[in-house]
UniProtKB/Swiss-Prot annotation:
Enzymatic reactions: heme b + 2 H(+) = protoporphyrin IX + Fe(2+)
GO CC terms of this entry: cytoplasm
Gene it is expressed from: hemH
Protein EC: 4.98.1.1
UniProt protein name: Ferrochelatase
Annotated source species: Aliivibrio fischeri (strain MJ11)
Length: 322
């Protein structure tokens, strides 16, 4: 009989503790110091980051955060906490939250599970599509924490779930619900967070996963390539990133006859700055100024029932298939 107690750690990227320049600067500093995210020579990157980028970007980004901040805190944190609560209720086992950068730390999440007697921990990074910049960074944080620990807990880490049937079903359901509320647009654009093209050239499988997710979503919705497509958002710096860029794609859709657009970001498990501000507001402005007539932003899955069911299914499969 297996007497081991299992716990679940949900992991997301992280968020500033407040919509202030100081808090944003601290968060971005930690995030952009990670070599998984920016692998530029440290002697070049660190002076550039601290001398130019952070002093300029932190105040600007803080204002953007202020525009989406919720009563209980950052949207990413609020929705992540709701996911933890819902998954814990569904599984009837301990579930904790950890962020790769900022609070709550991955370390504190694991310690919370250990204090509850968990000797087996399933780590679920909430990144459907694998990337060195996200999922691998979670692994790094865990390895760092246990670098000097003589006995490691029994870990199971979920690699990705880009083609999980319940994930695709949940995405499709969110699109259909939007159609019921707002009417069906001429086109569905799946906008994924971008990464440098160089990372993919060097073996990152992120783009392949994004393409497969889009393909499966199209099949689930019964849409043709004329009715659904994909692009990449949030480019940072001058280096070439995965294309087509969302900002450029939005400029050419209306001239092609697509006047009503539904936009969704399958790579984000929770709404955050990149969806609530960039995708919902900035991208809408680009599309409308380029001749668009109707722009519908479809929220992330957040704590949607099907999304929680998917998480529970992933966790359960790891427990009962041992």
């Amino acid at each position: 009989m297996n007497n081991k107690k299992t716990g679940v750690l949900l992991v997301n990227l992280g968020t500033p503790t407040a919509p202030t320049a100081a808090a944003v600067k601290q968060f971005l500093s930690e995030f952009l110091h990670d070599k998984r995210v920016v692998d530029m020579n440290r002697f070049i990157w660190c002076p550039l980051l601290h001398g130019v980028i952070l002093p300029i970007r932190a105040p600007k980004v803080a204002k953007l955060y202020e525009s989406v901040w919720m009563e209980d805190g950052s949207p990413l944190l609020v929705y992540s906490q709701r996911q933890v609560k819902a998954l814990e209720a569904r599984l009837s086992m301990p579930v904790a939250l950890g962020m790769t950068y900022g609070e709550p730390r991955i370390k504190s999440g694991i310690e919370s599970l250990e204090q509850q007697g968990c000797d087996e921990i399933i780590i679920l990074p909430l990144y459907p599509q694998y990337s060195r910049t996200t999922t691998a960074a979670v692994f790094d944080q865990i390895a760092k924490q246990y670098k000097t620990t003589p006995v490691l807990p029994n870990f199971t880490m979920i690699h990705n779930y880009h083609d999980h049937p319940l994930y695709i079903k949940a995405l499709a359901n969110s699109v259909r619900q939007s159609w019921e509320r707002n009417g069906k647009g001429d086109y569905v654009l799946c906008s994924y967070h971008g990464i440098p093209q160089r990372f993919v050239d060097n073996g990152d499988i992120y783009a392949t996963h994004c393409e497969r997710t889009t393909e499966l979503l199209a099949q689930e919705l019964g849409l043709t390539s004329e009715q659904i497509g994909m692009s990449y958002q949030s480019r940072f710096g001058r280096e070439e990133w995965l294309q087509p860029y969302t900002s450029e794609t939005l400029k050419v859709l209306a001239p092609k006859g697509i006047k009503s657009l539904d936009i969704i970001s399958p790579a984000f498990s929770s709404d955050c700055l990149e969806t609530l501000e960039e995708l919902s507001e900035e991208c809408k402005e680009i599309f409308m100024e380029s001749g668009g007539q109707k722009y519908t932003f479809i929220p992330c899955l957040n704590d949607d029932e099907l999304h929680i069911e998917m998480m529970a299914d992933i966790v359960s499969s790891k427990i009962f298939n041992k």
